Amino acid sequence: MAEGTKYHISINVNTAYLAEQSDPAADRYVFAYTITIANTGTVAAQLISRRWIITDAENVTQEVKGLGVVGEQPLLQPGESFEYTSGTAMATPVGTMQGTYQMVAEDGIKFDAEIPPFTLSMPRILH
């Protein structure tokens, strides 16, 4: 079996602008993102840590690293998924996030699950 199939994690992202927590007059734009992490490989894998690159519309980049997600290090059997919601604040109404989750498979192999870039946008900003 190909290694790419054995160790494979799919990531799906949905975003929302949180108007009630944002203050555009103070350049504070708050977004929530809901991520579904699915083990589409053939071996169990545990999410150990995360690394985010957050970039605003002025190309200001922030790197965020930490253990797990929302206080958890989920162990995903093949076919299982884990969903969580978190958030971030930026100084601009549009930005992007991308990154990686470091995973450890049940056989001890470490691998990164890429989080593809996604856009955070205040409604009616992007056309």
Place the predicted regions along the sequence by residue.
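A generic structural micro-feature
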Residues: 5, 25-29, 44-46, 75-80, ...
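Residue-level detector of beta-strand face positions
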Residues: 3, 36, 51-53, 100-102
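Terminal connector regions
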Residues: 89-127
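Low-complexity, acidic Ser/Thr/Pro/Gly-rich terminal tails and inter-domain linkers that flank the onset
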Residues: 1-28
